[in-house]
């Protein structure tokens, strides 16, 4: 947003403190559960008359990596408390008080990607974040890992994501 032009035209620009955080956070958790437990796959099979006992995997005591520990990322940390996740976070701004209270460990993005069972992205789309989840980064993830992006789609290189799924470099997204 061109703030100078907006100011000259008398247009007020503001950033709201309230976000749709509860809806986004619940969606993030639901997507984690859906992929890990293969809920959609099983539902589709049953509708097609196929009965496969696919248990999927539990989320309990996995490592959750959160890219972007702002309002939504912090809300996710609070929501998943009962899963006993080990929580890693990558963010340019560290809230040490929150991290200590909620047992969040800040780390660099490469450490987060290589150690996390689930990676959940909560970033604004900027010139710096556009395409940040490229082939190199996606291929650092564990083959059984899950990628959740409830931010903007352009943060992930879609061709690279497709390749990582097709080549089974990650479990699901």
PLM region spans:
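Phosphate/diphosphate ligand-binding glycine-rich loop within oxidoreductases
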Residues: 1-43, 147
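Conserved S-adenosyl-L-methionine
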Residues: 82-86, 171
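Rossmann-like adenosine-cofactor binding region
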Residues: 93-173
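Glycine-rich NAD(P)-binding loop of Rossmann-like domains
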Residues: 42-75, 84
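Gly/Ala-rich phosphate-binding loop of Rossmann-like dinucleotide-binding domains
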Residues: 77, 81, 165-166
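Short loop/helix-cap segments at secondary-structure boundaries that form the rim of catalytic
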Residues: 2-8, 80, 94-102
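Conserved dinucleotide-binding and phosphotransfer motif residues
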Residues: 9, 83, 115
